Amino acid sequence: MDNVYRRDHEMAYISDDAVMAQQKETKKAIREYNQVMPFEPEKGMTCLDRTGMKHKKNVYFEPPFHCEYGSHIEVGENFYANVNCVMLDVGKITIGDNVLFGPNVSLYRAGHPIHPESRNSMFEYGIPITIGDNVWIGGSCCVLPGVKIGNNVVIGAGSVVTKDIPNNVCAAGNPCRVIREITEADKPYYFKDRKFDEEAWAKINEK
């Protein structure tokens, strides 16, 4: 059983020459993306397409961006990632619509065994990460293998997300935990007790 098959079926695998050859082609495309964005956005998106990344419209990664394969990533529409986004996509990473990443957000689908002898044998693994719709992940957050983040979620800056997060909550911390529910009462406010002015509020309610 070859290691590309093992990797793609969520089995323990070793990064042999065949695996590394796939990464090499992606690194070329991502290097070009980081060089041309934001000055030549159409060319930049062509670079992402070369990796095999599946994405809808209005997808943007502020450079520098890093991923290992690209072909394992699916991104919904209206996605924005600030600088230094890292996706270790040794398997599937799925991101919904209307998702925002702060700077230095990392999705670590990859991992290694905890026992030293198993780890030293060079085996690694990848477990899927899923992020729902209407999610904002604050700066310097890490999302670890196997995590599912629900819809309409805010993850506070600096969080390490080790477990699933349900829909409609604010969560933060290391390890990340639910702080409170998000309700309709939050809609008129943009920060703590600061309300939107009339012009901004009217624009929000146009939709």
Spans of model-derived segments:
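Short secondary-structure boundary/capping segments
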Residues: 4-5, 51, 121, 128, ...
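Terminal amphipathic alpha-helical/low-complexity segments used for targeting or macromolecular assembly
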Residues: 1-58, 176-207
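Short-chain dehydrogenase/reductase
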Residues: 60, 100, 136, 154, ...
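Short arginine-rich
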Residues: 34-35, 164-168
